[in-house]
Design a protein with these regions (language model features):
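Charged, compositionally biased interaction regions
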Residues: 45-142
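Internal mixed beta-strand/loop scaffold within catalytic domains of large alpha/beta enzymes
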Residues: 1-34, 38-40
Length: 142
């Protein structure tokens, strides 16, 4: 999990802005340049999830565990529909897809969430397979 910027290129393509020193780049290296890498882009959700996504955690502590610690309860997760990834169950939207092996596009320029300005650079492209709206149902009894 991490917080990465995405640039919409069309109805089914998103540029994924991750730098070489981020975990997403490590995952892409593990998958290899010839293989698709599944992605799940989560939008919204509880503040502990967003905070854990940007926190520089040690490798032996997952972002999901840290979000649960911050929230004082286990984080509920659910499996994606189009791949084997797991996402927090309390996010608002999930965009599922995969990276296109070896394909990059020019992404940017943008200001990032740390307040810095990023110039145009080549970054991976994801193909969107589905967009899911998560609805939590609340029941009150009197």
């Amino acid at each position: 999990m991490g917080m990465y910027r995405g640039q919409i290129f069309g109805k089914k393509e998103i540029g994924l802005h991750w730098q070489a020193h981020k975990h997403a780049a490590d995952h892409a290296d593990d998958v290899g340049k010839e293989n698709r890498m599944p992605v799940a882009i989560c939008l919204g959700g509880p503040p502990p999830v967003m905070f854990s996504a940007i926190s520089p955690l040690p490798d032996n502590l997952s972002e999901y565990e840290f979000a649960g610690l911050l929230n004082k309860r286990r984080l509920r997760i659910t499996k994606c529909l189009t791949n084997d990834l797991w996402v927090p169950a309390e996010v608002d939207f999930v965009i599922e897809g995969y990276t296109i092996p070896g394909e990059t596009r020019t992404e940017g320029p943008f200001g990032d969430h740390f307040g810095y300005y990023c110039l145009e650079e080549e970054y991976p492209v994801a193909v969107v397979l589905t967009v899911l709206l998560f609805v939590l149902l609340f029941c009150t009894c009197s």
